[in-house]
Amino acid sequence: MDKNKTVALLNQDLEGEQAAVIQYLVHAYAMGEGEMACEIEAIAREEMRHFDWLAETIVGLGGTPSIKRGDMRTGGKSVSTWMQNDVLQEKDSITMYEEHIKAIAN
C-alpha cells in the first residue's frame, strides 16, 4: 500500500480517537465529581495518547493529520447507557483498526 493510502487510513483512526476523547469527556463531565468521572477522564487521557501517536505517525509518513472528528455516541441519560455507548465505540474502533492493519499489511 502506498503512503497516501496508509495516511488516509491512519487519519480515519485519528478521527476516531478524537471522537473517543470528546465522548469520554462529555460522559465524565455529565457524571460530575467522583471516582467514576475521574476514571473516565483517565481513559480520555489514554485516548489522547493514541491520538498523539497516530498524528506523529501520519506526519512521519509525510501526511497531514486530519482535524475532523469521527462519529460519537453521546446519547442517553444514565451512566449505564453512557458506559454501554463507550464500550460500543471501543468495539467499533477495534474492528476498524483490525481492518486497517490487514489493509496496510497487504
Q: What do these predicted ranges mean?
A:
Residues 1-106:
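Non-heme di-metal
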